[in-house]
Amino acid sequence: MSEVTFPEGFLWGGALAANQSEGSYLAGGKGLTTVDMIPHGEHRMPVKLGLEPRFTLRDDEYYPSHDAIDFYRRYKDDIALMAEMGFTVFRTSIAWSRIYPKGDELTPNPEGIAFYRSLFEECQKYGITPLVTLCHFDVPMHLVTEYGSWRNRKMIEFFARYARTCFDAFNGLVKYWLTFNEINILLHSPFSGAGLVFGSEDNREQVKYQAAHHELVASALVTKIAHEIDPENQVGCMLAGGNFYPWSCNPEDVWAAMEKDRENLFFIDVQARGAYPSYAARVFREKGIEIEWQDGDAELLRHTVDFVSFSYYASRCASADMNEKNSSAANVVKSLTNPHIPRSAWGWGIDPLGLRITMNMMYDRYQKPLFLVENGLGARDEIDANGEIHDDYRISYLKQHIQAMGEAIADGIPVMGYTTWGCIDLVAASTGEMSKRYGFVYVDRDDHGNGSLARTRKKSFWWYKKVIASNGCDLSE
């Protein structure tokens, strides 16, 4: 492996999401969102998948997002911790329902705007550049119950109004924007991804892809708006990344892997290239999907993103017969268990070379700068008798992936920056657990909402501080 060299001005930092960190789920005039309806425990996955509709909260269930890690009230202290590590970028999201509590109002909630302005000003104080996602798995529930969420074309108007409000309110404080977090998760986890709930008569593929069309048009429209408001604004898309390997060199397995890659890359094909890919027509025909277009949609889609951002935790594996092989249920994106790579405690593959492969595949395809905005290892952390957390396993994972990212840069790929996921421990989106920890900072909170919420620096905190100070040159453990 060659010596890792990162460009001058490379952005180093970490990422959180409003719905997994803020808590205070009704404070400051905020409205309910989809994630506020997703409980911890056995019902979590059926609700996330849209198979078990939830329109009201239940007294007998625990909802992790309601309190999360209390970032809403502790953000100044948390940003100070990020500054101590030397962050130059902090990725977070704006909760749509803090700005428009129902989602369809004509005027925004001033308390929500004031909160985020204060948050971004705090970042500015420390020289930390915000990277802001407009919708991170938290559609206002009113838009779900009254409009059917993204199956309804009216959502384009509501999202555009919300985005314009944010671009105006935070102009000069935020210039890097993402429209939808992991937009392809709509296909795999429809309720959490896009607020979709299915009826017994629905053609689910039709509903999902029509909703996807509305999101893609909305994304292009707000990209256009962002550039009109301030030409300095840069807007990116965001993919739940990870390439598919074929199970074998059997051509049928190779084709199956390519189809699975296309299923996920379809969204970025539209957002980065400005039109539906040619292969989509056959996919739609074979699935009985008929997308309803309106005049002007094709023209809007030509407003492509400035950069391509993505998450990468693990590669994936596909076969022509996914049911006969050893399938992994580690994440909502179905994959076979690759016998050639180690796995985390939650069954996620650990494959740093897969990151380099994914980055090369995406840059070959899009020829736009890349931004790795989620990467990390979910693991159980133990506090020793001295109150310390020695998370060498996390350091090892991140070191290997930073090296792989450096190799991708050496391959000629322009990479804007790197934000590790859950830089401060947060509620895991997939499981709702706190015990699945990603952070450099430990949060005293358990899976049932108990704990002081006190913050403790882990060993990885000091390691990442050294990495940033050396611009990625010193990865020694």
Where are the model-predicted features located?
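Active-site region of glycoside hydrolase catalytic domains
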Residues: S2-D59, A83, K102-D104, I113-E477
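Catalytic domains of carbohydrate-active enzymes, especially glycoside hydrolases
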Residues: R74-A95, H303-F307
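A short acidic, glycine/proline-enriched capping/turn motif at secondary-structure boundaries
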Residues: T88, S97-I99, F137-V139
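Glycine-rich, proline-tolerant flexible connector loops at the mouths of alpha/beta enzymes
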Residues: I94-P108
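Active-site mouth loops of central-metabolism enzymes
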Residues: D60-R74, R151-R153
